[in-house]
Design a protein with these regions (language model features):
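Conserved core of the sugar-phosphate nucleotidyltransferase
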Residues: 60, 118-204, 212
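Left-handed beta-helix
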Residues: 1-2, 203-372
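N-terminal nucleotide-binding beta1-loop-alpha1 segment
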Residues: 1-21
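Short glycine-enriched, charge-decorated loop/helix-capping segments at active-site entrances
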Residues: 23-27, 79, 199-202
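Conserved N-terminal catalytic core of the sugar/cofactor nucleotidyltransferase
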Residues: 1-7, 34-128, 132
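Short catalytic helix/loop segments, enriched in acidic residues and glycine
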Residues: 22-38
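Residues that recognize and position ribonucleotide moieties
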Residues: 28, 116, 185, 208, ...
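Catalytic cores of nucleotide-enabled group-transfer and carboxylate-activating enzymes in metabolic
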Residues: 6-7, 48-51, 69, 94-95, ...
């Protein structure tokens, strides 16, 4: 029997005031990619039929990025014109699924657009648990040492999930709960929209439509509500300010470096190596400390990079040595030795086998110049 349809609603309409930036929050960059793309990546193990991104602040810039760089997934977007809370945002998101009759009767994932550390396996486990138990809603929770600021998961004597209470609305007893809501859910689509219509902004201190209140609405109506506790609470960390952005990027960089080492790349000092997620490295590349590889940089087999080298959108051949060099949009041929203290300007090409020597500056050769 085929699995029921699965759609996803990604909430990416918030202003992100604490970022203090003109850039829309979903477009802040981690390891060379906009944050929102990592959230979409988390859907990759779930066979999602369609994803709807709810946009708001900077909507045009966010949708432009999705059209140019979005993953191989059917993605639509809808705009939340007024920030009336997460419940309203999901209601807006569901309008992006109304014309997709093939998705009726299925399930819908809801994820925030600012959780770039989510792993696909975690979301897949959430969907599997939701379907195996037949729950109307299944939430991803986590147990943490300091739950301050998070909504608490309130369970009954039977151990089942009864409600989620936001931090500002919680009683003293509820504030002592260490199980938090991650704002990540899987809902039976047929019950979600009716439950959203029962929300009231008068029921909470913020005067907003809380998506979290849907859990209590469903429980009180007799629907089963399930949960999955995240194995790694760090996965669900949101990015709300520059410090959290730096922490998330550090973890993504650690994963990226570890992944390349597992594929045959030597990192002499992993903690002092900085790789964008968009970089491509061949086997037996050696990266020395203080090296930054960014953008669409590609490095061939057996090449040594660094120390103290930064390459952005560069193509480096096999068996090269590039040390103490700064390069952008340049090419280095096989077997070339570049540096130390070299600069490769955009368009520069170092021929195969060249030894540039120290203090070299590579420039774009103009084919229309006097020597041509």
């Amino acid at each position: 029997m085929p699995a029921p349809p699965l759609s996803a609603v990604i909430l990416a309409a918030g202003e992100g005031k604490r970022m203090r930036s003109q850039r829309p929050k979903p477009l802040h960059v981690l390891c060379g990619r906009p944050m929102l793309l990592y959230v979409l990546d988390a859907l990759s193990d779930c066979a999602v039929d369609k994803a709807v991104v709810v946009v708001g602040h900077g909507a045009e810039r966010v949708t432009k990025m999705l059209s140019e760089d979005g993953p191989d997934l059917v993605i639509d977007h809808v705009e939340q014109h007024q920030q009336l809370g997460t419940g309203d945002a999901v209601s807006v998101g569901l309008t992006g699924l109304e014309e997709d009759g093939d998705l009726d009767g299925g399930d819908v994932l809801v994820l925030p657009g600012d959780t770039p550390l989510l792993r696909p396996s975690t979301i897949a486990a959430l969907v599997d648990e939701h379907r195996e138990t037949g729950a109307a809603a299944t939430l991803l929770s986590a147990r943490v040492d300091d739950p301050s600021g998070y909504g608490r998961v309130v369970r009954g004597r039977d151990g089942g999930v009864h409600a989620i209470v936001e931090d500002v609305d919680a009683t003293d007893d509820q504030l002592a709960i260490d199980e938090i809501n991650t704002s990540i859910y899987c809902f039976r689509r047929s019950v979600l929209a009716p439950a959203l219509r029962r929300l009231s902004p008068e029921d909470n201190a913020q005067g907003e439509y809380y998506l979290t209140d849907v859990i209590e609405v469903l429980h009180d109506a007799g629907y089963p509500v399930g949960s999955v506790v995240a194995d790694d609470p760090g996965e669900i960390a949101g990015v709300n300010d520059r410090a959290q952005l730096a922490a998330a990027e550090s973890e993504l960089r650690r994963r990226t470096v570890a992944g390349w080492m597992a594929r045959g790349v030597t990192m002499v000092d992993p903690e002092r190596t900085y790789l964008d997620a968009t970089v491509e490295l061949a086997t037996d590349v050696t990266v020395f400390p203080g090296t930054l590889l960014q953008g669409r940089t590609v490095v061939g087999q057996g090449t040594e990079l660094g120390p103290d080298t930064r390459l952005v959108d560069c193509i480096v051949g096999a068996d090269c040595v590039v040390e103490q060099t700064v390069g952008r949009a340049a090419e280095v041929g096989d077997g070339a030795v570049v540096g130390p203290f070299a600069v490769l300007e955009p368009g520069a090409q170092v021929p195969p086998g060249t030894r540039t020597g120290p203090f070299y500056t590579g420039r774009l050769v103009d084919p229309t110049g006097p020597d041509h």
